[in-house]
Amino acid sequence: MKNILARGGIEFLAVFLGIGLSFYVEQWQSDNEQKDLLVKDCQNILTDVDEDIFTINKIIDSNNIILKACDNIQSIVTSDEVILVDSIILDIKKLTYPTFFGITRSYKLSYSTGRLNLYANEKLVKEISKLYDHFYERLDINSNIYDQVGLKFLDQYVDKNIGYAIRGYDYSSKEIIDFFTNKLFINELITFSGRVSGYLQRLKETKEQLVIVKKLLIDYLAAQNKSEVINWIKYS
């Protein structure tokens, strides 16, 4: 009887250990699969970050040109020198309001699966989250404000009053000079210029965070010691 009980206990223990080992192996395989998928997630996020760095540099350059044109116009219309209408119109034509909206698809996909938070290192998660949940969201808000200010100043005010001159139609120099030297125009220009300057600051801050995230992603991928990952980094 004792032998039967002992044998039964051993069999039960063997079954229990077998189930436990099987569960452990399945969990180990699942974790490895998720980590491999995270590598692909990070590759995709890095591709998005690279594209965003290229785009944000172009937007920064464009807004620097716009800010310089604003400064030129303000200097001309507030000086005592004779206003050269053709010159100021050339600067007015440079005024637009280009905005930046980052690519978020790869980050959102990885975040929705939980892989990023579960398997990536803490610093990488922190900086990626900061980029998308802080810098991009703040920049989206500023982009929308910039759009509204630009629309009001350029489309609804400048274009409405002297659009004909900007488009090359005949104009009276006196009418154009009166428009540019009016205090209303100067105030609107100062408001627009201030918005350009503020938006440029947000762009530069976001670019700095993009560069930080890019470096961390490259370091993380390289640390996986997988030849396909290293080759992807090398030739991307």
Residue spans for each PLM region:
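Hydrophobic membrane-insertion alpha-helices, especially the h-region
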Residues: G9-F23
